[in-house]
Design a protein with these regions (language model features):
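Rossmann-fold NAD(P)-binding glycine/threonine-rich loop
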Residues: 98-120
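Conserved Rossmann-fold cofactor-binding substructure of NAD(P)-dependent oxidoreductases
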Residues: 55-67
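N-terminal Rossmann-fold NAD(P) dinucleotide-binding loop
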Residues: 13-14
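Conserved N-terminal Rossmann-fold NAD(P)-binding element of oxidoreductases
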Residues: 4-8
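C-terminal catalytic/substrate-binding lobe primarily of soluble NAD(P)-dependent oxidoreductases
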Residues: 139-445
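Rossmann-fold cofactor-recognition segment
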Residues: 45-58
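ADP-ribose/adenylate-binding Rossmann-like module
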Residues: 86-104
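Helix N-cap at the beta1-alpha1 junction of Rossmann-like dinucleotide-binding domains, i.e.
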Residues: 34-37, 101
Length: 445
């Protein structure tokens, strides 16, 4: 019987364990710093075992990695390197759902010598977006066509009927990772020209996009497209954009939160006996009580907004103008924001999230005709059960793990889905049995 370690028991881990335990009948070791979290993922299933482990370096993982056949790391992205180093020592492959870490890529040659695979970007976005892109590219090329413009979008949002807060967002994945992504710069290509967007300009660089059959959203660029150009075999004159989708209003909300300093995660502060009102006034260099002007007015002036601007009302809804002590006593400004958001922007048990993965490719064909090819996946979460995001992230990496164990993926070294073009077809076929299907459409022009 195959044995798998799932390292990390965050919001995405349960569907991974469910698939490997119930569909594959594999033995699972769930590992987390807090054993209660690992138990929540494993449950009382006889093939599962929960273990508590504090991971300070790669050697802490050796007893577990040495015991299993393969490892799935669901840890925060920077920690994958510890897992990879332990896997190298023991000759075990590792899969993750995160963007590929340069430190792990640097181990590719050693992994090849050991005959093992480091397979990253096996989640929803990144992951399913790559597979949808590869699927359309293969179809276009199979008909003699050439892609000239690619747009790929992904998101996890409240389902339409549960988009019931003024921020237009709720947390279905770890908020620390959410804000790390919110500060990461991006780059895309417009007819071969590289457009770079720094992290502090990300939310100014948005536009509206209509997703066929679903609705209108804001999109802003998602990470750097550069490495995907070669992996997808794209020409230098391509237009290629990867973006995230959000409900309208989101980007300005995030922009202004950043501009008043709430994304600061570096400086620790003492919030003992500090009210939200005082804290918010201090963000814009004011005193909450020294004159007649309210903090709301001071924030609006700082941002050059009207006092009735949507953002001021949303900041008020989050509680930042309340005259009561801050709930956390010590932390960073970002910690204060996270605390308020998690209390106001979490899903109720009956509420549903939704994921959307949408790819649009404009193609030219030898007869001079042109087409826009669309592939769209949309799925809602299950009330009182798994979120759509947890399943869209967890199922691809779980299915990929089974494929590696069964010898259906024979690659070694460091890879992501675009560098393994034979991966997506069988994976998407099985994913369809779980309800995750790309709907395709062709628009001639």
């Amino acid at each position: 019987m195959k044995k798998i370690a799932i390292i990390g028991s965050g919001m995405m881990a349960k569907p991974v364990a469910d698939y490997l335990l119930e569909v594959c009948n594999y033995e699972i070791i769930g590992v987390d710093q807090e054993v209660s979290k690992a138990r929540n993922v494993i449950g009382d299933r006889s093939l599962g075992k929960a273990i508590s482990l504090m991971i300070k370096d790669s050697y802490d993982l050796d007893p577990i990695v040495g015991e299993v056949d393969i490892v799935i790391s669901m840890l925060p992205r920077p920690l994958h390197i510890h897992v990879a180093k332990s896997c190298l020592r023991h000759g075990k492959s590792m899969l993750t759902t995160s963007y590929q870490l340069p430190e792990v890529v640097a181990l590719a040659d050693e992994a090849k010598k050991k005959g093992i695979l480091f397979l990253d970007e096996m989640g929803e976005d990144p992951g399913l977006d790559h597979m949808g892109t590869q699927m359309l590219l293969d179809e276009i090329r199979g008909e003699g066509g050439k892609a000239v413009d690619i747009k790929s979008y992904g998101c996890g949002l409240p389902a339409f009927e549960h988009n019931n807060n003024p921020m237009g967002y709720k947390f279905s994945w770890a908020p620390t990772g959410f804000f790390a992504a919110a500060k990461t710069g991006a780059a895309y290509y417009l007819k071969g020209k590289r457009i770079e967007v720094s992290g502090d300009q990300l939310f100014k660089h948005f536009r509206l996009v209509d997703i066929d059959g679903i609705g209108t959203f804001e999109t802003y660029p998602n990470r750097d497209c550069k490495k995907y150009l070669e992996l997808f075999g794209l020409t230098k004159d391509i237009s290629f954009y990867r973006g995230l989708l959000r409900y309208p209003g989101y980007c300005n909300n995030m922009r202004y939160l950043g501009e008043i300093g709430l994304f600061d995660s570096k400086q620790m502060e003492n919030f003992e006996n500090v009210t939200y009102r005082q804290f918010t006034a201090s963000l814009v260099g004011a005193d909450a009580y020294k004159n007649d002007r309210k903090p709301e007015e001071k924030v609006a002036e700082f941002l050059n907004l009207d006092i009735n601007a949507d953002f001021i009302h949303r900041l008020k809804w989050l509680g930042f103008f309340e005259d009561r002590p801050i709930d956390i006593k010590k932390g960073t400004r970002l910690d204060v924001l996270l605390d308020r958001m998690l209390k106001k922007m979490s899903y109720e048990p009956h509420e549903k999230d939704m994921i959307i993965v949408h790819v649009e490719i404009i193609a030219e064909f030898p007869d001079k005709s042109g087409e826009k090819r669309l592939a769209t996946m949309m799925m809602e979460g299950i009330p009182y059960s798994d979120s759509a995001m947890s399943r869209a992230v967890g199922l691809p990496v779980a299915i990929g793990t089974r494929m590696v164990l069964e010898g259906k993926i024979n690659a070694v070294g460091a890879h992501i889905p675009p560098s393994l073009p034979g991966l997506y077809k069988p994976l998407l076929e099985e994913l369809a049995t779980h309800g995750f299907v790309f709907t395709k459409k062709t628009i001639p022009f």
